[in-house]
């Protein structure tokens, strides 16, 4: 039962940024950040780099490289990931104050879902980033904001890893700047046509809810890490992340947990229902109350709660699925969100990867029924979603998992920055309001990068 050696470093609240900055241009350097959020899920920042092994999935193929051997496989990517975890000699016991004890950490793009469900291929695959990019790490730096403690854990010598961290230096990079205006992949008129097509499907009983998105794109130069730091400070999202890939980067400012697994206990917190924040405290409080009591938003939320109960029920202990919180309003800097919580137990015979596969991609960003909604998304959205609406997170050696839904997430690739926003459309949705909601969700992010 190999457990990591742990050393404690002097406290500084910006430790994650401080230690990550010199690594931020290194492929496979990844940071899960709690976004300085005033939020119950803001406790930990997790930093990793220099993985023992890597897994990259593109379409039907996964490239696995463990430093000694490299091979390509058409097997289920999450099965390959589980095999890599099982091959490592590390079996630490879960630790309340250290959520990640080494293991798998990375990106599970929306289109990884094509490996688990049969979907059409209408939408253009125009961003050549992987569907899955996950490293297996035998060390991590964990910043605990609650206990004000910084732990460096390693299955090797943590002092040596600390020296390595301190020896890293950043290559000089140009300051970040947009070099063009943001442009959508659809006009207002095209959005309206797609909205009406969704309505036709809804009224024919084909589905109950479809998440329809538009994608914004701009050219940029310079350092994506600098852009992330600016956005992270301003947006304070509890499931933020910066992922440096071999070609490109993911900048995530997500408010949404996908699935957490802690010592066999499952929790998922789907967001469905959004209204913009208002400047006046009194009006803002009324806005929150309006969202809490909105029959349309509650109906949308309930559909996704039912879908997630069903997805998790595929692998959970029979009879263990519960809904302890329904329709709770959570405020974020730009918007109020309506959130529900679903819990269950995972049988000891199954792994975190089985749970992830059963529920992937998250129902809150597809619609219901899920597979039909995904087919409609592929038909109506011009391009594949790629990293957006997938998941970022970890599967720890100790069996724990925590993942986000990658909404409010930017993809940087070949000098282009992409940012999508959508909303769940139901039978009584109003076209102008749905169109405006896509802007409410990302306007703040888009404008911050223009300045």
Regions inferred by a protein language model and the residue ranges of each:
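Extended alpha-helical targeting/anchoring segments
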Residues: 1-451
């Amino acid at each position: 039962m190999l457990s990591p050696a742990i050393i404690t470093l002097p406290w500084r609240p910006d430790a994650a940024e401080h230690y990550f900055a010199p690594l931020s241009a290194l492929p496979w350097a990844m940071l899960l950040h709690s976004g300085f959020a005033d939020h119950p899920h803001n406790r930990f920042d997790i930093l990793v780099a220099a993985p023992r092994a890597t897994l990259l999935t593109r379409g039907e193929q996964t490239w696995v490289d463990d430093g000694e051997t490299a091979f390509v496989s058409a097997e289920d990517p999450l099965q390959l990931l589980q095999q890599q975890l099982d091959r490592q000699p590390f079996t630490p016991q879960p630790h309340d104050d250290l959520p990640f004890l080494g293991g798998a950490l990375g990106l599970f793009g929306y289109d990884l879902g094509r490996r688990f469900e049969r979907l059409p291929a209408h939408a253009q695959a125009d961003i050549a980033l992987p569907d899955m990019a996950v490293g297996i790490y035998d060390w991590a730096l964990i910043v605990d904001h609650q206990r004000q403690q910084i732990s460096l854990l390693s299955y090797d010598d943590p002092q040596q890893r600390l020296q390595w961290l301190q020896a890293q230096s950043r290559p000089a990079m140009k300051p970040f700047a947009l070099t063009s205006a943001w442009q959508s992949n659809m006009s207002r008129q095209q959005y309206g046509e797609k909205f009406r097509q969704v309505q036709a499907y809804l009224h024919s009983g084909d589905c109950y809810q479809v998440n329809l998105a538009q994608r914004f794109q701009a050219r940029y130069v310079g350092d994506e890490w600098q852009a992330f730091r600016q956005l992270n400070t301003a947006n304070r999202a509890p499931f933020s992340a910066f992922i440096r890939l071999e070609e490109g980067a993911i900048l995530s400012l997500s408010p949404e947990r996908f699935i957490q697994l802690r010592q066999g206990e499952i929790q998922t917190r789907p967001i469905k229902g959004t209204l913009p924040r208002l400047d006046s405290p009194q009006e803002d409080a009324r806005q929150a109350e309006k969202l809490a009591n909105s029959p349309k938003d509650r109906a949308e939320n309930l559909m996704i709660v039912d879908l997630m109960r069903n997805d998790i029920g595929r692998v959970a202990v029979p009879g263990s699925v519960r809904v302890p919180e329904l329709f709770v309003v959570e405020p974020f800097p730009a918007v109020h969100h309506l959130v529900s919580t679903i819990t269950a137990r995972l049988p000891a015979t199954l792994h975190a990867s089985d749970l992830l596969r059963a529920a992937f991609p998250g129902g809150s960003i597809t619609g219901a029924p899920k597979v039909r909604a995904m087919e409609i998304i592929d038909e109506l959205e011009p391009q594949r979603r790629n990293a957006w609406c997938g998941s970022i997170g970890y599967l720890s050696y100790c069996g724990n998992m925590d993942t986000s839904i990658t909404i409010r997430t930017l993809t940087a690739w070949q000098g282009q920055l992409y940012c999508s926003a959508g909303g769940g459309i139901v039978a009584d949705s109003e076209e102008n309001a749905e169109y405006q909601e896509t802007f409410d969700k990302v306007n703040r992010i888009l404008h911050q990068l223009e300045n």
